[in-house]
């Protein structure tokens, strides 16, 4: 089942789903994240509203331009939200989740529930759109907002940063993302999990490249996480392939050193929530790890993640007796004795408020950013961000780098990561940081990938028929302290 058709599988009346989807679109326009909207919905509404909201937000620019042509006088915000939601769902960019006549009929029914006086107006506008759709689509395609479904400032920034790739990045952001899994290396192998999925009738692909640590699996079709075998028992997590690069990069060998970090190394995950990278580190290494986050509520999500994966904070195993205890390479089971995980709330820019004075062997700084590299996975991001956000976040990133660098041991390494394709948050940030350091005090590692631009979706294969490497947009820089 694809996200564009997922809503059709739920028993809730479409008019109710459209009403709440319009509320979600209106909230995003007002600056609220889609996640914040969805968590307030009743459980029976949430899946359908999420599916329709993702579709509507991907085509919101085209729908907004079309509405301006169909109804030049902007209607009240609640009416406009329902109208552009329906137009986006009718837009020919991808298969509609419902038949056209059903969408129009149910949008009018939603209007009668939401704003009865506007029902006839919405009916007339939508039916006119269907009559004049080809001409309207052609007209809208001549505007940046209508052609690319991103704010003009975002388009301009990508043109500046990626003159050869900006169109591909913008158009790719409206394609559905792959669903990539990370198999818990303490519980099994990626190959064994692919075979287990096949027994359920689910097609999946290995990403065997060493850069991903050998634990990545891509589903041919996304599915609800609770339908994944072993998810509740901690055998697998959902994590994009780009994010799965962090742990192998941080723990692996540096230039001229084949050993990598030793067992028991002291590691800081400086912006740990929601805990995916923290967990990956613990799944593949024996560490003394401090997971830090400025938000205590988000830090609780790290604890939830570790609990589900049976990676608790005192080093003991939490593997139920009825589950197979897959052996570690050294023959142990569960979290290895001697490993230690501590969760602490604190601002990475203010080490004096949380640091105990013991230096770290390695620091992971997955810094707050615009999330411009994961917009296909979070389609509300493009409408929530403002033109000056990248500059403001870059200042925060710079402050974090400056505050954390002194906490490293000589010979230690810092991995800087953002899920952004904007260079101000990636290579430009690192270039400026290195220029501020004393000469010879830092050694950038050439095997870190730098900017990773979002790759094709999981329907794309190379000439051999093998699935392409699939990942979100990311940036990685690995720096050794000399």
Model-identified regions with their sequence ranges:
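Short beta->alpha hinge that forms the Motif I/post-I loop of the SAM-binding pocket
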Residues: 293-297, 389-392, 396
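Class I Rossmann-like S-adenosyl-L-methionine
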Residues: 1-224, 331
